[in-house]
Amino acid sequence: MTSSTLLETPAAAADHDCASAPRSLAGLTRDGLAAALLEIGAPERELRMRTAQLWHWIYHRGAGSFDDMLNVSKVLRTQLAEKFTLARPQIVTEQVSTDGTRKWLIRFAPSAESDRLAEVECVYIPDVDRGTLCVSSQVGCTLTCSFCHTGTQKFVRNLTAQEIIAQLIIARDRIGDFPGLAPRDGKGSNSGSRLVTNIVFMGMGEPLYNLDNVVDAVSVLSDGDGLSLSRRRITVSTAGVVPKLPELGEKTGAMLAISLHAVRDELRNTLVPLNKKYPIAALLQACRDYPGASNARRITFEYVMLKGINDSPSDARELVRLLKGIPAKINLIPFNPWPGTAYECSDDAVIEKFSDIVFNAGYASPVRTPRGRDILAACGQLKSETEKLRARALLVAGD
């Protein structure tokens, strides 16, 4: 397979310091926008109206300049432009798979929340009836799941809510998903039908170890006056941070996905080391108690198919037994290889037999079609260049 790569800016530009640059308002919550307006002296009596105007232009219209905001007074636009921008984070690379999947490597400049440059990957997966954006919630990951490429990258920091939301703004910019605006690269479509219909927190990081920012991000993503994504089309995937599950359900109303991958603790301890802290029985009880779980809002259990490891008929039957009483569907994921891994994907016939056992027991058990494998954009393949970036920064500091 081949893929095309768009280099937005030279990688060497990573060493520039953007900490002193004007702050961007793109990605802020309503409270954040209101605080910015107060900074430039906007009257408190106008705060609600002015915040609503900014919200509409940033999130509904995708404005890239304050000059685009035609119903905002020229005086206010000038004041905003003197202090702030609507700039997006830097796109280091964009890769387009032969199947249409796109992967962006995004660089975040230092900010008030963090003095570190950082990079993450996010992925857009177009399909016939939907378009799914897979977003990252952390730079690197603490969980070291043995089958996951991200797990080989050291944890650097949490992403802010603004940085999470910026991933969607960038995607909508690039593919032309804001009404009336052409794609930034000329390759997308702005025909009027929404291109990003679903958001999945299945990129880099464990969302529940960054829950406050994930909660704020979901509130912006689902706001009906802006990005307007249904909470039923927002899925948060977790390896099983059991104490945080009730809070996730109560504060977001998002759909839940569990990275299960094994039906016995001794194996899951290896595949998902977090299991040593929160074993399968505790995790599944938390799922039974998850706020809002029902046949209409089923919990998705993700199960990566590893050859000779977790793919036997007895594993399938045990999975069915474990999930009894939980409104669930099982997403079977053919393992996606990455450089240095020792795992292999189960054979197609083995996956089909596993799926049949689960399906015949009454559970939906779709086999996920791998997308973006040729650009390392498929499930479990994401890993940013942040480690190299940190090394370059240290070299520059020593010069």
Swiss-Prot record:
Reaction proceeds by a ping-pong mechanism involving intermediate methylation of a conserved cysteine residue. Residues 127-376 form the Radical SAM core domain. The gene is rlmN. Its main location: cytoplasm. One of its GO terms (biological process) is tRNA methylation. The keyword Protease does not apply. Belongs to the radical SAM superfamily. RlmN family. This is Dual-specificity RNA methyltransferase RlmN.
